[in-house]
Amino acid sequence: MYKKVNLSGIVISEPKSVKKFKTKDSIVNVLPEYYHTIADKRLEIRKDKDNCWFCKQDMNTYNPYFIETLYGDHIGVFCSKICRDSFANMIKSVIALREEPKISLLPLELYEKPEEVLEVINDLRHKEGIYGSCILESDKNIIKLTLRCHCNTN
């Protein structure tokens, strides 16, 4: 299908654009010898499916959403896309995600009245095409939550 080419000690056997990753292995720690690892554990991911991992609402009445990793694994259980994307935004620097989150809410512990955020989550649960984020207005010590959607969506 493709031809093997030798270039002065460099072997190109697969074009990069069609190369498939064969393993999930990655370099975990590359440290100079003067650093010593003081904690190295392999921990299982939580298996709780009763409550939303972001807002802690009971999942019995909602269709579950989950975060999909680059390798096709599923992480978490969420009551809405808003919760899923907000949680994904918090972990995307550590876990390779299949798609970029579109919404970024801060954890509910930061809000004086988290029930106001839960109301927004519940009101927009089934709405498609939502994107947005939160900004801390430090001079007023207020969190400005701004969510938008495209005009042609429900």
Curated annotation (Swiss-Prot):
UniProt KW keywords: Activator, Transcription, Transcription regulation
InterPro entries xref list: Poxvirus_VLTF2, Znf_MYM
Disulphide connectivity of cysteines: none
Record bears the keyword Transcription regulation: yes
GO molecular function: zinc ion binding
Keyword check for Transcription: yes
Protein family (similarity comment): Belongs to the chordopoxvirinae VLTF-2 family.
Name this protein carries in UniProt: Viral late gene transcription factor 2
Organism field: Fowlpox virus (strain NVSL) (FPV)
